[in-house]
A protein has these predicted regions:
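Tandem amphipathic alpha-helical repeat scaffolds
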Residues: 32-38, 70-78, 108-122, 150-171, ...
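Intrinsically disordered, low-complexity tails and linkers flanking structured cores
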Residues: 104, 122, 134, 143-144, ...
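Conserved mid-sequence domains
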Residues: 172-183, 197-207, 216-224, 238-242
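Alpha-solenoid helical repeat architecture
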Residues: 60-66, 101-108, 142-152, 188-203, ...
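Short charge-dense sequence patches
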Residues: 2-3, 18-22, 121-131, 169-176, ...
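Amphipathic alpha-helical segments of tetratricopeptide repeats
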Residues: 50-57, 90-97, 132-141, 176-191, ...
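TPR-repeat structural position
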Residues: 42-43, 62, 82, 165-172, ...
Length: 242
C-alpha cells in the first residue's frame, strides 16, 4: 500500500510538471494577487493587475478575469473608474456563468444522445432538440468564439447522427464554412488546452460529414488522425464531457 501511494504521488507530480505552460505561469501570478495588493504601492498594484488582465484576455480566461476586476474595483474605490471595473466584473461573471451553462448543456446533450441511441424514443429525440435550442439561445447572448464552438459541436453532431436527412447547416452558415471558421478559432488560440483537444472532435465530425456525403477523398484526410487517436477519443473524451 505504501509503495503504491508513493508511486501514485510520483505519477501525479510528473503529470503536473507536464501541465506547465505559459497559462499556468499566469495562474500562479493570480494566486499571489493578495501579495500584489497588500504588499505594494497602489500604483504598482494597479499596473501589475492590468498586466495580468491583458494576459488573461489573451488566453480567454474569463473566470480568472473576474478576480482581477474585483481587486481593480476595490483599488479604485475613491476613483470614477470604480464604476468601469464594476461593469467589467459584472459582465465577466455573467459570461462565465454562460460558459458554464454551455459546457453543462453539451455534457447533458451527449448523455441524452446515449439514451436516444439505445432507445430511439421520440421523447429522447425531442429532448435533444430542446437542448440544441437552449444552447443556441445561450450562444446568442455573447459574441463568443467559445460559445460558437460549443454550439457548432452539438449542432453538427446532431445533424449527422440524429437528423441525418436534414441539411447540415448552422443557422445560415453551411457546414463547410462552419468547419473553416472553427479551424480559424483553433488556430487563433494555439495555447488553449480545451481547443487543443476539441480539434480531434472536429476532425472526427469532418470525417463523418464527408463519409455521410460520400466524399471519400476528403474523408481520407481525417481518417488517419482520427484512427490513430481512436482509443483516446473513445476512452477519455466521454469522461470529460464530449
Amino acid at each position: 500500500y505504501t509503495l503504491r501511494s508513493r508511486l501514485n504521488q510520483r505519477i501525479e507530480e510528473h503529470l503536473l510538471q507536464q501541465m506547465e505552460s505559459p497559462r499556468t505561469d499566469i495562474l500562479k501570478k493570480l494566486a499571489n494577487i493578495n501579495e500584489v495588493t497588500f504588499a505594494r504601492k497602489r500604483t504598482i498594484s494597479i499596473a501589475t493587475l492590468k498586466k495580468i488582465e491583458k494576459e488573461l484576455i489573451d488566453y480567454d480566461l474569463a473566470n480568472e478575469l473576474t478576480v482581477v476586476y474585483k481587486y481593480l474595483r476595490k483599488l479604485h474605490i475613491h476613483s470614477t473608474e470604480q464604476f468601469h471595473y464594476s461593469q467589467l466584473y459584472n459582465r465577466h461573471v455573467a459570461y462565465t456563468l454562460a460558459i458554464d451553462k454551455a459546457e453543462n448543456l453539451l455534457a447533458d446533450y451527449f448523455k441524452g444522445y446515449g439514451n436516444y441511441f439505445f432507445s430511439a424514443s421520440p421523447q429522447a429525440k425531442l429532448a435533444l432538440k430542446l437542448q440544441i435550442r437552449e444552447m443556441q439561445n445561450v450562444a446568442r447572448l455573447y459574441q463568443s468564439h467559445r460559445l460558437y464552438v460549443f454550439f457548432s459541436c452539438m449542432n453538427i453532431f446532431h445533424q449527422l447522427f440524429v437528423d441525418p436527412d436534414e441539411p447540415v447547416v448552422l443557422g445560415s452558415e453551411a457546414a463547410e464554412d462552419n468547419f473553416t471558421n472553427i479551424q480559424r478559432v483553433f488556430e487563433s488560440h494555439p495555447l488553449d488546452p480545451l481547443y487543443y483537444h476539441l480539434n480531434l472532435v472536429f476532425e472526427f465530425l469532418r470525417l463523418e460529414y464527408y463519409n455521410h456525403f460520400r466524399v471519400f477523398k476528403q474523408a481520407e484526410k481525417y481518417f488517419e488522425e482520427v484512427n490513430d487517436a481512436a482509443v483516446n477519443l473513445l476512452m477519455n473524451y466521454s469522461v470529460s464531457w464530449v
